[in-house]
């Protein structure tokens, strides 16, 4: 039973969430890159002029945002992994301190 003032963390869950975030991030990136590839492959003979230029602007902005999303999701997964490692280490340090203090009794 844990007390209300204790820190509890499920390290396996943290690692799992980081891995799932990475996997989904790669899936999203692949889908977005496939879409950009299809849109970039539309020949100029299909459409042109101002509409094509504006559409290309939208595609460029969308591509930039999808790249930003990829980097942000990657940073989130890295942060989760870092937090898991830091919390695990802190727990081990605290356990050693408690064991040492108990040995002095």
From Swiss-Prot:
Disulfide bonds: none
A GO cellular component annotation in the UniProt record: extracellular region
Pfam family, one: WXG100
Record-annotated membrane-spanning stretches: none
Location within or outside the cell: Secreted
Keyword field contains Secreted: yes
InterPro entries cross-referenced by the UniProt entry: ESAT-6-like_sf, T7SS_ESAT-6-like
Keyword Secreted annotated: yes
Other observations noted: Elicits strong humoral responses. Induces significant lymphocyte proliferation and up-regulates the induction of TNF-alpha and IL-6 in tuberculosis patients.
Subunit relationships: Forms a tight 1:1 complex with EsxT. Complex formation results in induction of alpha-helical conformation and stability against chemical denaturation.
UniProt family annotation: Belongs to the WXG100 family. CFP-10 subfamily.
Name of the protein: ESAT-6-like protein EsxU
Organism: Mycobacterium tuberculosis (strain ATCC 25618 / H37Rv)
């Amino acid at each position: 039973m844990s007390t209300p003032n204790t820190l509890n963390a499920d390290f396996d869950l943290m690692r799992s969430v980081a891995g799932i975030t990475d996997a989904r991030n790669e899936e999203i990136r692949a889908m977005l890159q496939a879409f950009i590839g299809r849109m970039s492959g539309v020949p100029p003979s299909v459409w042109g002029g101002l509409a094509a230029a504006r559409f290309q602007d939208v595609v460029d902005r969308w591509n930039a945002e999808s790249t930003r999303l990829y980097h942000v999701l990657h940073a989130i997964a890295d942060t989760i992994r870092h937090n898991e490692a830091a919390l695990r280490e802190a727990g081990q340090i605290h356990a050693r301190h408690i064991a040492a203090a108990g040995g002095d009794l």
